């Protein structure tokens, strides 16, 4: 597909927005889903100060801004800010005219229907898209891994979910959603670093902690054993330089933080961990297809990027499953972007072209068309 008529693929995550052209093998633009507004009164005339900043620009000016994420737990909570992010995506990042390209958007499974209708409405009415489609994130990740059957554990910044898929069909009764993801881990790391005497409180400082999490955290294979190693030696300690040059040291926080994926009680949450959620999801499926799901457990999303997570999942699910069951955890190296890559594959398939919702269909039926055409 040429860029001039190529479909746009926009994966709006709670934390990062990934955007690009169908047929490409990686997104052209990846930027934080943030809208920042100045905390202070502008005093310099002619500075060209704006009343809001989006993405990387908001990130770089974060010291003077209040940062807000318009998507929480995978659901858009602030549509005005969301529109700003889409505007920024089309005009500044991809530099395209949205009225000239079909656009494929993604959403979390089990999202409110109204969320999906509003997305459709904004695409057609604000951006005049010629055609659009909304796809479920986890299904796209499975496409990207080259499978049509498997269970996807998709964990991003705002929401995690397990989606069993058989021969290309998601099994909605067995989809489980867990509102525990990267942002909760960042918040938890902020909290346990405070116990060490480092205080991080503002929205800008949260971004520093997110960076510490991404660079230094890992999942322990055996949590108790790792805790005793950390207590008896300093071999697990790492240092991190803050933007002002101050150096902080972190030890057992490195694996205590992502451990909450497996033990949500650390965060004061009652839910089951990601391993048990995956198992429960498989158990909700027909007995005949479970074997295929165990053997094709695919990890996707940024929160599955912690070193050690695949081995730990293998260990935990093996402990839950029948003893003879073959269990395979697939952790593709590009899993941070596998939702986007799957979208790029889907939107460039010739068989997909009749699936688009056209502007004409929208004008005839209104926003509810999205439930009939996208599933």
Swiss-Prot record:
In this UniProt entry, the residues modified to N-acetylmethionine are 1
Query: What InterPro entries does the record point to?
Result: Actin, Actin/actin-like_CS, Actin_CS, ATPase_NBD
Pfam families, sorted: Actin (PF00022)
Reaction catalysis annotation:
ATP + H2O = ADP + phosphate + H(+)
* GO cellular component terms given for this protein: cytoplasm; cytoskeleton
Residues bearing PTM N-acetylglutamate: 2
- GO: which molecular function terms? ATP binding; hydrolase activity
Location(s), subcellular: Cytoplasm, Cytoskeleton
Keywords of the record, alphabetical order, are: Acetylation, ATP-binding, Cytoplasm, Cytoskeleton, Hydrolase, Nucleotide-binding
Q: What does this protein do?
A: Actins are highly conserved proteins that are involved in various types of cell motility and are ubiquitously expressed in all eukaryotic cells.
The UniProt entry's sequence similarity note says: Belongs to the actin family.
Record protein name field = Actin, cytoplasmic
The source organism is Branchiostoma floridae (Florida lancelet)
Its organism's taxonomic lineage begins at:
Eukaryota, Metazoa, Chordata, Cephalochordata, Leptocardii
